[in-house]
Curated annotation (Swiss-Prot):
GO terms for molecular function: D-tyrosyl-tRNA(Tyr) deacylase activity; Gly-tRNA(Ala) deacylase activity; Ser(Gly)-tRNA(Ala) hydrolase activity; tRNA binding. Keywords: Cytoplasm, Hydrolase, RNA-binding, tRNA-binding. SUPFAM superfamilies: DTD-like. This is D-aminoacyl-tRNA deacylase. It comes from the Bacteria. It is an enzyme of class 3 (hydrolase). It comes from Halorhodospira halophila (strain DSM 244 / SL1) (Ectothiorhodospira halophila (strain DSM 244 / SL1)).
Length: 154
């Protein structure tokens, strides 16, 4: 699984003009499942998002995590992160998990966040046309992955 996280002062996501998810200080996580992902990747990615140290300490170094500080997480499903853009002028979404699998893994990711988070967890709606608003803090943006385990003996 893939996520792009952005540190934010506040963020919200709308569907059909209605706010469906909103947080104050925290992280926006754009989330995508790819072929071969399973619940282990969704849970590992949730752990990484919550534990990734992107918030400044008293000396200005990135030493605080959303988990440490009780910050919120706004999770937004975004299959376009799996795009293959290596050739041509049109992205290919072949690497993305099929919609049914993607939705199930997004829900597993959300459940894992909610089980572990010390702050609020909000989300967008899988498969919906969403409008995301955020106040980027920094800006601080990272690409995180929880790749599928390679096939073969363990």
């Amino acid at each position: 699984m893939i996520t792009v996280i952005q540190r934010t002062g506040s963020a919200r996501v709308r569907v059909g003009g209605e706010v469906v998810g909103e947080i104050e200080r925290g992280l926006v996580a754009l989330v995508c499942a790819v072929h071969g992902d399973g619940s282990a990747q969704a849970q590992r990615l949730a752990e990484r998002v919550l534990g990734y140290r992107v918030f400044p300490d008293a000396e200005g170094r990135m030493n605080g995590s959303a988990l440490d500080l009780g910050c919120g997480v706004l999770a937004v499903p975004q299959f376009t992160l799996a795009a293959d853009t290596r050739k041509g002028m049109r992205p290919s979404f072949g690497p993305a998990a099929d919609p049914q699998t993607g939705q199930a893994l997004f829900e597993t990711f959300l459940e894992a966040l909610r089980e572990r988070a010390t702050g609020p967890v909000a989300s967008g709606v899988f498969g919906a046309d969403m409008q995301v608003e955020l106040v980027n803090d920094g800006p601080v943006t990272f690409w995180l992955e929880a790749p599928p385990r390679p096939a073969g003996p363990v």
